[in-house]
């Protein structure tokens, strides 16, 4: 699995730990926009008053453009849905993860949360109308991913691309 999330009941405050990414803290007291969006998701799901701790174990490095924040959001939402017997569908999980991605990146494309939710190669289009189609291959396809070990935040990259696009249009 790309991300494993464990949930446990708590008698105190809600906490989120992502040790591999050096993230931990109390959900309600965080100033991080992504964590705030998780709290909004929990309110939407009706579990914000429940006491629980989340421990997330990503097998994706942070800030390398591989959709790690989306994978974590999807994993957390699935875990909470299962724990509280909410029976969320993949489209519902995808919509909620998109909320987290928008908070994390400002303007999210939707591709990362969609791939993380459905877990298979897809054709994805957000506008003018959403298209999600599974890609089928007759033979296995090799995929090579290079990681430069130079972290960069997607939100900063998106903002830079948007600024250059506006300058040239």
Regions found by a protein language model. Give the residues of each.
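FAD-binding core of FAD-dependent oxidoreductases
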Residues: 1, 63-73, 107-120
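C-terminal nucleotide
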Residues: 3, 7-48, 57, 80-86, ...
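Short pre-catalytic strand/loop immediately N-terminal to key active-site residues, enriched for Gly-Thr
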Residues: 52, 57-64
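DPxDG-like acidic metal-binding loop motif
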Residues: 66-86
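Short hydrophobic alpha-helices at membrane interfaces in multi-pass membrane enzymes
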Residues: 91-92
């Amino acid at each position: 699995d790309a991300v494993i999330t464990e949930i446990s009941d708590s008698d105190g405050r809600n906490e989120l730990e992502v040790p591999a990414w050096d993230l931990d803290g109390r959900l309600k007291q965080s100033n991080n926009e992504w964590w705030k969006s998780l709290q909004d998701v929990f309110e939407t799901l009706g579990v914000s008053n429940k006491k629980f701790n989340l421990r997330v174990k990503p097998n994706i490095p942070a800030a390398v453009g591989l959709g790690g924040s989306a994978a974590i959001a999807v994993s957390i939402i699935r875990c909470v849905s299962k724990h509280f017997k909410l029976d969320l569908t993949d489209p519902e999980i995808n919509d909620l993860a998109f909320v987290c991605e928008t908070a994390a990146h400002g303007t999210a494309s939707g591709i990362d949360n969609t791939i993380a939710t459905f877990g298979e190669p897809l054709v994805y289009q957000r506008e003018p109308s959403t298209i999600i189609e599974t890609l089928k291959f007759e033979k296995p396809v090799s995929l090579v991913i290079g990681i430069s070990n130079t972290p960069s935040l997607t939100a900063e990259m998106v903002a830079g691309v948007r600024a250059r696009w506006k300058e040239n249009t």
